[in-house]
Amino acid sequence: MRILHVLDHSIPLHSGYTFRTRSILREQQALGWETFHVTGSKQGASAALEEDVDGLHFYRTPKSGSMLSKLPVLNQMEVIDGLTKRLSEIIPLIKPDVLHAHSPSLNAVAALRAGKKFGIPVVYEVRAFWEDAAVDHGTAKEHGLRYKLTRALETYALKNANAVTTICEGLRRDIVERGIAADKVTVIPNAVDIDKFAVGGVADLALKRKLGLQDMRLIGFIGSFYAYEGLDVLLRAVPAMLARLPDLRVLLVGGGPQDAQLRQLAKDLGIADKVVFTGRVPHEQVQQYYDLLDVLVYPRLSMRLTDLVTPLKPLEAMAQGRVLAASDVGGHLELIEHGKTGILFKADDPQSLAQNVGDLLAAQEQWPALRANGRRFVESERNWPISVARYKAIYARLTGLAAAGTQDR
């Protein structure tokens, strides 16, 4: 089985998107499949048209230098056209059995064009609806023209793909509501590489002293500071928690668009000396910061994006046997069972966060069970071998090939 994956971007860029891709590719290769990989022009400038990264070979698509690439909306068509051309160059060389396009729909449309030209079935994998992400990032207005055009293109891709996969039940429901046959849509859930996460990490006391956090209870967040993560809700809950737990401190590890606003909010709330912002830390040091935290908090705001899409970070926390608290948005409800694998609080509500996280900090006798249940959940349901195995039936149905290794050719 030879699969050509059509991607928005990939490693060496770091994002949830690229890490999911890397995990899928490695697991598919472990099954004996040959995987090939091309990124669109949004990958950015590359020194060459082909690149090896972390043991994976990527074909790159050069950016267009035309005037159209600088115009809103029309520049998206340039992305599709450039990727379609690149696919037409690559496909005769590698002769794939399946084109597997991943979000956004620009990649799917290019793959559909190439699939029609060469007679190859297309799988479209929806990781999020990018029109909703654009609303949160401020580049589109909900139900505005750009939003509607992006949504229409998404629906076109869903209807014309031979099969559709997606990362969670929330997205699957929305896809089916667009008129896509339910039996055409398969959930390939986000997962973790269990072997990369150890349980029982011990806090680095030297790092704790360096941060001025010795002898403190620590809650916090590790990741990118996007508005939808709701870190402002966490900060607004801190004064109430401090009244109950004076030794509480908040550790925020990472950076992003909301960094400056969050630092200012901490000052405005009078808690700047109770919140530590580390900035971005090297990937190899992230584990040390996880080991410092008593409770990880994921206060995502309630909106279409967070109600439909499951995040990866809570799964990574469970894989480490961490204690976690999260808002009750739809994406979290798919992952976290209240009182069993974590605790949930009302989204967008600092008072609910303060009450529930405060109760959790005061009930340490519950932590061992929460840790064990979370780890068991990812071991049994959210690991990559189990998730990626779901592609077997999809590929076999589209190609008529047994979903095994390269001997099928």
Regions found by a protein language model. Name each.
Residues G170, A191:
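Carbohydrate-associated surface elements
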Residues R2-V6, L213-V238:
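Conserved donor-binding/catalytic core segment of Leloir-type glycosyltransferases
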Residues D247, S352, D359, Q366-E381, ...:
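A short, well-ordered alpha-helix in the C-terminal region of glycosyltransferases
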Residues Y298, E316-A319, V323-A326, I336:
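Short hydrophobic beta-strand element within catalytic cores of glycosyltransferases
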Residues E337-G339, I343-P350, D359-E365:
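Conserved acidic donor-binding segment of nucleotide-sugar-dependent glycosyltransferases
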Residues I94-V98, N162, K274, Y290-D307, ...:
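Acidic donor-binding loop of glycosyltransferase active sites
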Residues A260-Q287:
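Nucleotide-activated donor-binding/catalytic signature segment of Leloir-type glycosyltransferases, i.e.
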